[in-house]
Amino acid sequence: MNPKKFPMPTGMLLKTDDEEKFLPFQNPTTYKDITVELKPNGEALRVYVTAGTTPVQRVTLYFADPLPEKAQVLGGVWERGYGDYEWRGYVPHRVMPWYFFLQSGNKTEAFGVHTQPAAMCWWTAESTGYSVYLDVRCGGLGVRLNGRTLCAAELCRAEYEDADGFTAMGEFFSVLSPNPILPKSPVYGANNWYHAYGHATEDDVLREAKALAELTEGLANRPWFIIDDCWQIDRADNYNGGPWRAGNKGFPDMPGLAKKLRESGIQPGIWVR
């Protein structure tokens, strides 16, 4: 791996609750009571946002840093892949959450954001350059910093020679997440979505959990049973938005069900969205 430094952005789009303003970027750049400043941290680049009373929603930094014209691009996803995780050509409006990779010849380039940022971050890219979007909203409204400084994100970049994409991705993810938060023991067990598809009751859960307990008898690390979409009070085939305050008639006592699972040696889990 060869860490690479970012050049300075050439432009910045600042979005508040009331307006959007494009500004040529000079480090730092100030507009009204908002200042955006970039500071190196080793090979990485930290993005700091300071503001008074103006609610800040998003900071977009544009880098006029040419990329290989015929590269294949793979970007991140917000939650998980839905059959759309792929290497493909440039699509300038394609949203790539957290990171993206470029493959050109025997070289793989990587761009990303360190884990645990203070913003929701995504990238766009084309052969003439790339942008990173830092959404710092608090809920749906701009954050009110009231004189404070927010380290919104730390940007990272690296280059890999003679490395296939999978290897480069694995190495770069270790850079983005140097201190991963891992469970004490492997997480395994059952989830009732991919056979019940939302049509299950407490009796079904207890029957399947009993089979799971028998299959894992004697193991100190006990399995989980995840009660997926099926339990919530307003469960329907065309809607899964809650509320999440109680079970439906098939699940009359959710705390009691969790207790029964624990007593059978199963760790209870629950699905919400």
Task: Report residues per predicted region.
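Aromatic-lined carbohydrate-binding/catalytic grooves of carbohydrate-active enzymes
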Residues: 186-273
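Polysaccharide-binding surfaces and accessory modules of carbohydrate-active proteins
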Residues: 2-120
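Short loop/turn segments at connectors of secondary-structure elements within structured domains
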Residues: 55-57, 146-147, 221
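Short, ordered beta-strand-loop transition motifs
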Residues: 17-18, 37-43, 124-131, 135-137, ...
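Short low-polarity hydrophobic stretches
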Residues: 47-49, 146-148, 225, 261
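Short, flexible loop/turn elements at secondary-structure junctions
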Residues: 51-53, 65, 117, 138, ...
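Beta-strand-rich recognition/accessory modules
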Residues: 93-186
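Short alpha-helical segments and helix-capping/turn motifs at coil-helix boundaries
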Residues: 46, 136-139, 174-175, 209-212, ...
